[in-house]
Amino acid sequence: MENVLIIRYGEIMLKGDNKSFFEAKLTKHIRGAVKDLGDVKVYKMHSRVYIDVEDFNADEIIERVKKVFGVVCISPAVRFPVDFDVIKETALNQIKEEMAQRGVKTFKVESKRVDKKFPLKSPEMSREIGGYILENTEGLEVDVHNPEVRVYVEVRECSFVFTKKVYGFGGLPLGTNGKALLLLSGGIDSPVAGWLVAKRGVEIHGMHFHSYPFTSERAKEKVVDLAKILTTYCGRIKLYSVNLLAIQKEINEKCPEEEMTILSRRFMMKIAERVANKIGCDALVTGESIGQVASQTVKGLHVTNAAVELPVFRPLIAMDKVDIMDLARKIDTYETSILPFEDCCTVFLPKRPVTQPRLEKILRSEALLDVEGLIESAIGDMEVERISLDDE
């Protein structure tokens, strides 16, 4: 008998002639997630990925693999040659383990006969295995509707028996849908937005705007910490840090106070687009949500969009704040995001920011500034950092 992990994927199965491309990407990313653990054998067979875990910590591997986009669920299983007596005994042993560990009193057997040469059909297998379990245990009942534990039996080229399914995040393998630049602040929203877009197979890099020395070094470090958390899902990330202070001072000196936020936002988008084009990104990603703050009204978003030509992905656009917070907790960015450090949006914050900006009026104000010079200067002083999970 061998201990293996069965890794299943979902949407990849619908990719038709491109399926093998997506499968290869997924297998590559799974290998990458466990490569530092040693010579872990990862391989694809019959529209699944398998990992041999006989000599490894299966729980640690599961924790890593479930964060790989494209993985729907993982089952730690026992694999052995097809022998129905061994199948029954293995199923019984796994049920006894569940009874000892969790005190379960109800169960169900779910069988799947993939190898049609096997003489018993799936329902017959389930009945015989269930009967064998009942004969050899006490205080256990069958519950086909809501069992405390399910015993899964599969007969393929060999037999698999397991009781657990650990769910991943699904989605598509990273790098199968282009590349995007995430405007990464230190808040709750933007890391979640980046994670959601990455889940659809988009490679993510980050751009952070700060107003140092009006904002602190620790505020910048917080963003690096968020980027490191994202690397557990997204792999290595390039983080571009841009000081917006000179631009904010110019806006504060020459433009109406209430337009500070929307004008600053347009500069951020212009700078992000300029860098995105240079590094081969096909889109920008932001954590904006309709009505959440003054610059995120529909008119505000229209004025912001008008600053760039690249598509802007806003995966949080219709989400409530509480739902965004729940997802941030799920992906482990929440506790870092709520650390009380200032960001560039708090510098020169207007008392009454415009909530219904008109594009033509904003363009007139923008014409008072040396837009091109300010952008070039900001990009010229930009810092680039390569972030990976291994960074200390």
UniProtKB/Swiss-Prot annotation:
Keyword Cytoplasm: yes
Residues engaged in binding ATP: L183, L184, H208, F209, R265, G287, Q296
Keywords: ATP-binding, Cytoplasm, Nucleotide-binding, RNA-binding, Thiamine biosynthesis, Transferase, tRNA-binding
Catalysed transformations (reactions): [ThiI sulfur-carrier protein]-S-sulfanyl-L-cysteine + a uridine in tRNA + 2 reduced [2Fe-2S]-[ferredoxin] + ATP + H(+) = [ThiI sulfur-carrier protein]-L-cysteine + a 4-thiouridine in tRNA + 2 oxidized [2Fe-2S]-[ferredoxin] + AMP + diphosphate; [ThiS sulfur-carrier protein]-C-terminal Gly-Gly-AMP + S-sulfanyl-L-cysteinyl-[cysteine desulfurase] + AH2 = [ThiS sulfur-carrier protein]-C-terminal-Gly-aminoethanethioate + L-cysteinyl-[cysteine desulfurase] + A + AMP + 2 H(+)
Descriptive protein name: Probable tRNA sulfurtransferase
Region forming the signal peptide: none
Family in the record: Belongs to the ThiI family.
Organism superkingdom: Bacteria
Main localisation: cytoplasm
Domain THUMP, first and last residues per copy: 59-166
Classification via SUPFAM superfamilies: Adenine nucleotide alpha hydrolases-like (SSF52402), THUMP domain-like (SSF143437)
Subcellular location: Cytoplasm
Pathway(s) annotated for this protein in UniProt: Cofactor biosynthesis; thiamine diphosphate biosynthesis
PANTHER family, alphabetized: TRNA SULFURTRANSFERASE
Record flagged with keyword ATP-binding: yes
Disulfide bonds: none
GO cellular component assignments: cytosol
BP GO annotations: thiamine biosynthetic process; thiamine diphosphate biosynthetic process; thiazole biosynthetic process; tRNA 4-thiouridine biosynthesis
GO molecular function, one term: ATP binding
Record gene name: thiI
Enzyme class of the recorded protein, top EC level: transferase
EC number(s) reported in the record: 2.8.1.4
SMART domains attached to this UniProt entry: THUMP
Reported function: Catalyzes the ATP-dependent transfer of a sulfur to tRNA to produce 4-thiouridine in position 8 of tRNAs, which functions as a near-UV photosensor. Also catalyzes the transfer of sulfur to the sulfur carrier protein ThiS, forming ThiS-thiocarboxylate. This is a step in the synthesis of thiazole, in the thiamine biosynthesis pathway. The sulfur is donated as persulfide by IscS.
UniProt source species: Alkaliphilus metalliredigens (strain QYMF)
